[in-house]
Amino acid sequence: MDASVDKILAGKYPAKHHAKRVAARIRELGHGEAGVIYLESQKTRMIEDNDGEMPFRQRRNFFYLSGCPLPDSYLTYNIEEDHLTLFIPPIDEDSVIWSGLPLSPDEALELYDVDAVLSTADVNASLAHYCSAKEGTKVFAISDQVSPHITFLPFQETDFDVLKRAAEEARVVKDDYEIALLRRANEISSKAHVAVIKAAKSAMNERELEATFIATCMSYGCREQSYHPIFAGGTNGATLHYQKNDQDLVDKTTGEKKLNMLVDAGGEYRNYCADITRVFPLSGKFSAESRQIYDIVLEMQMTSLAMIKAGVMWEDVHSNSHRVAIRGLLKLGILRGTEQELFDKGISVAFFPHGLGHYLGMDTHDTGGNPNYEDKDSKFKYLRLRGVLACGGVVTVEPGLYFCRFIIDPYLASPELGKYIDANVLEKYWSVGGVRLEDNVVVTQNGYDNLTTAPKIPEEIEKLAAGP
């Protein structure tokens, strides 16, 4: 593990810095110099018709301003006084019997970058104090995230709109601490991807490889997964968000291992996500057709990475990836026509139907992307990130090519579009399934910093897959 990451993470999560960033964004959006930010953590929730608790996932905006993973907590930030207060649950004697002593206010003050820690019983009194201290104080909260017992009546004005926007826009640019968390999530997840490739030689089912990935992540400190992982053997890789992860890796017809394994998985480290995709041959060596498609996707990714720096339009990077795909598929004879004609007609969408990437942070599809799902151009409809890349933003770069009959058949059946695809040549590639390569990179002023260390050079992949 990177020792420089350990050094950064030895300090406190910079909640106070984040609170100032959000307050500054509120001011930039025209909402004055004073006021109180109010946020609640996620509540403890029970499984329906059961006495067990649902899996807990902290509200991201609350964590951003507190660094606190506890449920049933609150925070206030007095913008004018620059004072951040965390409110945590008091001791419940019945709970102590089962769960042990909770975190005390003094312990919380040592752990978190806040100015004061009080009991949740003190929230309303503290809110009333802010109002009495200065007439006309305004409170900023998020609609539908305020408990019924909380009262804002003493405040002259309550704003339920701007805080969510301000927090989500502030979260786009990551500080050094956040980048360290993302780097650690990538370090661990990359180790897990390597473990999966090595384990595949003896594995007989997709679920065995999922188990290997999760176990490796947990052993290094990622107790949660960033999202439901994808372990897609053979043609299952043609389904973008394949979910079953329980199919045999041996083809029942031939009795041999399926061609490829697509793994899209990332561990979550202290609420920050990795999102990595790799493809490897289950036999230890790519088939000729698989290698041809892999090489095109790798070129799509490498040329995209070369374009990345602050100020670049993401749509331009995405468009370039489509052009690389078109040139590659033309060379193989799968497509017919000119590059420009195929680009204008959107034929590459039949094989590359999703966006090139998205922002990454506490959420896998992180805030600030501004997608336009109403876009009439099929190449951009599912692009989750639009506009200029921000310096300090973290993006995924995940081009792919898929041989999915459900997507491609309508193109083949179209009198207008079918002429651009050679069905006879295409026939050789259905068994490839899908190839996607995904790295997580920090956008810098003059380029990028790739956080992902999992191997992707095909010769390295084959060596790992073939085993000793």
Swiss-Prot record:
Cofactors required: Mn(2+)
Family annotation (Pfam families): AMP_N, Peptidase_M24
Lineage: superkingdom: Eukaryota
Cofactor binding, per record: Binds 2 manganese ions per subunit.
Signal sequence annotation: none
The keyword Kinase belongs to this UniProt entry's keyword annotation: no
Residues that, per the record, bind Mn(2+) 2: D264, D275, E438
Catalytic activity entry: Release of any N-terminal amino acid, including proline, that is linked to proline, even from a dipeptide or tripeptide
Keywords: Aminopeptidase, Hydrolase, Manganese, Metal-binding, Metalloprotease, Protease
Family per similarity comment: Belongs to the peptidase M24B family.
Protein name: Probable Xaa-Pro aminopeptidase PEPP
Biological source species: Blastomyces gilchristii (strain SLH14081) (Blastomyces dermatitidis)
Organism phylogeny: Eukaryota, Fungi, Dikarya, Ascomycota, Pezizomycotina
